[in-house]
Amino acid sequence: MSQNIDKIQDHVELFHQPEYQELFENKKALQGMASDEKVAEIAEWTKTWEYREKNFAREALTINPAKACQPLGAILAAVGFEGTLPFVHGSQGCVAYFRTHFTRHFKEPFSGVSSSMTEDAAVFGGLKNMIEGLQNAYSLYQPKMIAVCTTCMAEVIGDDLGSFIGNAKADGSVPQDFPVPFAHTPSFVGSHITGYDNMMKAILLNLTDGKKPTTSNGKVNFIPGFETYVGNLRELKHLTSAMGVDATILGDNELYLDSPNDGEFKMYQGGTTLEEGADAINATKTIALQTYPTVKTLEYIEKEWQQPTATYRPWGIKGTDEFVMALSELTGNPVPPELELERGRAVDAMTDSHAWLHGKKAAIYGDPDLVMGMLQFMLEMGVEPVHVLVHNSTTEFEEEAKALLASSPYGQKATVWGGKDLWHLRSLLFTEPVDFLIGNSYGKYLWRDTKIPLIRIGYPIFDRHHLHRYSTIGYNGAINLLNWIVNGLFEEIDRNTNIPSKTDISFDLVR
């Protein structure tokens, strides 16, 4: 064996060793797999227009989805509030998946519990699990609030969360006045952004239950949406502070998802206080930074709180300008020199790199609001989007995206693909290649197959560290986006021009 105490091989090298290569060959023979030549033949066929037509004729099969299920978004909304423990009414396996999904992206512990439903609960209902689960969660983890959502199992059998929680309180599992907001989050409907919306609405409804708007507190509420860049929360606080806005961020998970290593574990870090959440009903306005994960929440605020709402996407120069000017109009404060300086730096950086991006063709996939923000920025840089794919799409998103693309000379060649998955995108990239692809870590398989460089922007990002700490919004965020894209293209140029005396005529020191 090449792996021994004197010669430790990491996993990158280990499986290239002869004994493992022999094992893999024996496995292929045992399983009766097709020959390498046949696999290569079929692989080539999947790159053709003929295969693309068959691929797009799929109706009842998803291959490599570009979305997740509702509870994932629900628990992200929950941890944005002080001392809140997400409680998933369903099996342990589901909540383990949700927690590891966030832990791998943020590189932080992510707390959450389940009602541990098994076969008996699937037949007889999960009331007993709810009663015992809430009691254990309350006594063991001492939260200030428990936010309950559901998985497929609980939804298929029709468990009534409101009734179950009421019975649990009557049974003494938690005090009667203890806040237990709940949201039904069936995974077979919508996606993670729907779950975020459902839980955010449920928490605000619970915290303001029985309250009516009184005298305005002079504050402005901000709802980040399904936000996986903690740098964006810091950037939001920076922009609102610079503009003199008395802001309440509803669902502030910045510290929870980017906590310091100070030698002491804290289960609940940061978050919007429950008092701030309850007082949000008295704000002058609520502003969302994402449209599609806040639809029901904003409808609730407008109807029940009688509070005006608005949505802004501060991506790129134009989007940030609109956001900053809206804050200026809201407060009556002028734009401070600090933000003018940041804007000038962003414009200068974009001017420096414009020649390298102008006219480049791009493909992008991700959540609706992230894709809209990136389209705004790319069009400002003269990038020409070709494939715009959103798996968790809606008719409203597709109309909005098409209108944005039609408004720019650089968006005329783009096609919006709603409800399509990453296997669809693979066909698109082979039949209509582009210069670069923007997406999350799952795009690396598209990069491997098509050799189209991947710029990692989105969620989840598992295979690169610390990108979630940066901002993508504001003037500072525009510089980050530019940095990732243009330097990603430079890396690709260097990879393609590094053979001495053959391709290195453009292996330049200065770009």
From Swiss-Prot:
Transmembrane segments: none annotated. The gene is nifK. It comes from the Bacteria. Belongs to the NifD/NifK/NifE/NifN family. [8Fe-7S] cluster binds at C69, C94, C152, S187. Its cofactor is [8Fe-7S] cluster. This molybdenum-iron protein is part of the nitrogenase complex that catalyzes the key enzymatic reactions in nitrogen fixation. GO terms for biological process: nitrogen fixation. One of its GO terms (cellular component) is molybdenum-iron nitrogenase complex. Tetramer of two alpha and two beta chains. Forms complex with the iron protein (nitrogenase component 2). PANTHER family: LIGHT-INDEPENDENT PROTOCHLOROPHYLLIDE REDUCTASE SUBUNIT B. InterPro entries: ChlB/BchB/BchZ (IPR050152), Nase/OxRdtase_comp1 (IPR000510), Nase_comp1_CS (IPR000318), Nase_Mo-Fe_CF_bsu (IPR005976), Nase_Mo-Fe_CF_bsu_N (IPR024564). This is Nitrogenase molybdenum-iron protein beta chain. It catalyses: N2 + 8 reduced [2Fe-2S]-[ferredoxin] + 16 ATP + 16 H2O = H2 + 8 oxidized [2Fe-2S]-[ferredoxin] + 2 NH4(+) + 16 ADP + 16 phosphate + 6 H(+). Its EC number is 1.18.6.1.
